[in-house]
Design a protein with these regions (language model features):
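Positively charged, phosphate-engaging catalytic surfaces used for nucleic-acid and nucleotide handling
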Residues: 1-200
């Protein structure tokens, strides 16, 4: 049907209708896919927040120093971003100084940072690392391994463009969700059928 519609004469009413129908369906699919990608990015960012909290807790438990996590994370970022520290990447991507870098990273980079955090936290615990130099070395190593995996697939995290601010994305998704109907009627359930649209 799609090929017939696409190759048919749009002056014929049926063909014009079919072409319009398929164009609308294609656009709907594009919008659904874009929304799913946005939700995936938001979920990845939330997982990164959780892994950063876990790693921060593990580091604080061992070092009893509130600033050590930021130093260790920045050195890990330098390993992931080809020598660029957290501050360097913020400047490179135009991220406001008071905002987290990860709020402006694309999904793949967020997931890369999350994996490196998980690896570091796991190894700090299992190897019972208790000094800042050893934990830093572990985190740098985890980020380096993740960077190498990305590089083998032709991905350089520092060369990826910034993504939309995750806060704006979250607000837009929340707003869009509130605009959705509370209950979507099932096929064949229109007002007037089955007692005014209520389920049978």
């Amino acid at each position: 049907a799609y090929l017939i519609a696409q190759n048919g004469d749009p002056r014929k009413e049926e063909i014009a209708f079919a072409q319009t129908y398929f164009a609308v369906q294609t656009r709907k699919q594009e919008l659904i896919e874009a929304r799913l990608e946005q939700i995936e990015r938001l979920e990845a960012r939330n997982r990164l927040t959780a892994s950063e909290k876990e790693l921060s807790g593990v580091i604080f438990e061992r070092l009893r120093d509130h600033e050590s996590f930021a130093r260790i994370r920045s050195k890990g970022d330098a390993a992931l971003f080809g020598g660029r520290t957290t501050l360097d990447m913020k400047k490179h991507l135009g991220v406001p100084e008071a905002r987290p870098l990860a709020d402006f990273l694309p999904t793949i980079t967020i997931k890369a940072k999350d994996l490196a955090n998980e690896m570091t936290a796991h190894n700090v615990k299992t190897r019972d690392l208790r000094t800042e130099p050893t934990i830093t070395s572990e985190h740098v190593g985890s980020n380096r391994v993740v960077r190498e995996a990305l590089a083998k697939r032709g991905i350089r995290p520092e060369q990826l463009p910034p993504a939309e601010d995750v806060r704006k994305l979250e607000r837009r998704l929340d707003s869009d969700t509130r605009k959705l109907p509370k209950q979507v009627p099932r096929l064949g359930e229109e007002k007037g059928e089955n007692g005014g649209g209520d389920p049978p």
